[in-house]
Regions:
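Active-site-proximal polar cores
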Residues: 1-20
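Short, conserved turn/kink motifs that form compact alpha/beta structural patches or helix kinks used as
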Residues: 19-99
């Protein structure tokens, strides 16, 4: 693993007057950056995604988060892939509005 990323989980609490207050919980993980294939880029683009990066990390690091921070940029995680014979998971990232 040659880089660091932060998986971001949103947490919500209700305050005294019933308003939902959101907060973020960041968790540091080690990742490796991989190139997106042309096929992945094309298929994601067909579905309205703006694919940017694919990262790999140990599968135990990922708990269903949908936002990640990598190299001071926020991305949405639009797809994951976990090979049955590997302890790594692939995280496919896209730039989305609001991240």
């Amino acid at each position: 693993m040659d880089g660091v990323a932060y998986l971001i989980k949103m947490k919500y609490k209700t305050d005294k007057i019933g308003q939902n207050i959101s907060s973020e919980e960041k968790r540091k993980i080690y990742v490796s950056e991989r190139a997106l294939t042309r096929t992945e880029y094309f298929k994601a683009g067909q579905n309205g995604m703006n694919p940017r990066i694919m990262l790999t990390t140990a599968a135990v690091n990922y708990s269903g988060e949908s936002v990640i921070e990598y190299e001071n940029m926020r991305y949405g995680i639009y797809r994951t892939y976990h090979k049955f014979d590997s302890d790594e998971i692939e995280l496919y990232l896209h730039k989305q509005a609001g991240t």
